[in-house]
């Protein structure tokens, strides 16, 4: 014995399937059951059928994602504690080094060595300040110190440490090449 709701649902599905078969639209999935499709190319079923309430069971059920993007060559995994990392080999944990990161690290350490520490604010070069002072002292104002005295008072003190022998920024102007190919003489950096 069928109820009225069953008859309506069955009638609707039969009419819907008949309409899909008789129509000449390009969409094949309207009105068809996608579970009956045997050519499921993009569907993946997990062999795990248990509850997913624990993190370990969830990790087992999910497929392992090998890379974040096509440029990332390593594996990505989060750790709750450092003791979990002891079982993995070091090569799986380290990020491979490329030329850009090595050059950036070398320039950063050289900049720290030249300035005598990490500075968050850019400072004016001693040479530029002494040239401005020298221009104003040549105008006849004797109250300002001469260029040589000013240079001696503003020369940064050098510290010997893990960076080896450092040279003041003023004594070693460097030439950098920009992306456009122009040379820039940089005294501060």
Swiss-Prot record:
Subcellular location as annotated: Nucleus
Disulfide feature: none
Compositional bias (Acidic residues): 33-44
Entries under InterPro entries matching the protein: OxStress_Response_Reg (IPR051992)
Keywords: Nucleus
Cellular component GO terms held in the UniProt record: nucleus; plant-type vacuole
Disordered as annotated region, ranges: 22-49, 128-147
BP-aspect Gene Ontology terms: response to oxidative stress
The protein's name in its UniProt record: Protein OXIDATIVE STRESS 3 LIKE 2
Biological classification of the source: Eukaryota, Viridiplantae, Streptophyta, Embryophyta, Tracheophyta
